[in-house]
Curated annotation (Swiss-Prot):
Residue sites binding AMP per the record: 31, 36, 57-59, 85-88, 92, 133, 144
Job description of the protein: Catalyzes the reversible transfer of the terminal phosphate group between ATP and AMP. Plays an important role in cellular energy homeostasis and in adenine nucleotide metabolism.
Name recorded for this polypeptide: Adenylate kinase
Subcellular location: Cytoplasm
């Protein structure tokens, strides 16, 4: 199973990816984790990413795609993978699909976790309070959600147009949401 989980901040992507990894016995791939691993390993891509990040800039699509290609050659990916929160724009989606076609591992499904904005703000605010993060004001959260909607809505449409998108209600108990995702990807 080769799966992408999309959803706004606070939608439960990371939580569900962790659960699905165990259930489906496949690798969980997070771009943030990939960046940290490549930097820690001192690879050429890691060095490039560190230089960009140290300058306060976003890592380019090319660097992320290079890291993804490297990650997809690891043995734990042979049975499949869950990509959590990537791709974030249509250019990344096109490049990733090209890479997956090249290595003979096209996506089986893309799942969009749908959660109402007010609930997302509530979830993130609650999480921020538990973790003691003062920077997660409702205004800042709304701004992050707007950026997500501006950049990722076209990715959702991109995969919907290819017939690989499943929209799943991301509200409810964790077991219920997991069951909805499993039903959607096995349908």
């Amino acid at each position: 199973m080769r799966l992408v989980l999309l959803g706004p901040p606070g939608s439960g992507k990371g939580t569900q990816a962790t659960r699905l990894k165990e259930k489906l016995e496949i690798a969980h791939i997070s771009t943030g984790d990939m960046l940290r691993a490549e930097i820690a390993a001192g690879t050429e891509l890691g060095k490039q990413a560190k230089t960009v990040m140290d300058a306060g800039n976003l890592v380019s699509d090319d660097i992320l795609l290079g890291m993804l290609e490297s990650r997809l050659t690891q043995p734990d990916v042979a049975k499949g993978f869950i990509l959590d929160g990537y791709p974030r724009n249509v250019a990344q989606a096109n490049a990733m699909d090209g890479l997956l076609a090249k290595i003979g591992q096209p996506l089986d499904a893309v799942v969009q976790l749908d959660v109402a904005t007010e609930l997302l703000v509530e979830r993130i605010a609650g999480r921020a309070k538990e973790q003691g993060r003062a920077d997660d004001t409702p205004e800042a959260v709304r701004q992050r959600l707007q950026v997500y909607n501006d950049q990722t809505a076209p990715v959702v449409d991109f995969y919907a147009g290819r017939g690989t998108l499943a929209r799943v209600d991301g509200v409810g108990e964790l077991d219920e949401i997991e069951a909805r995702i499993l039903a959607a990807i096995k349908a």
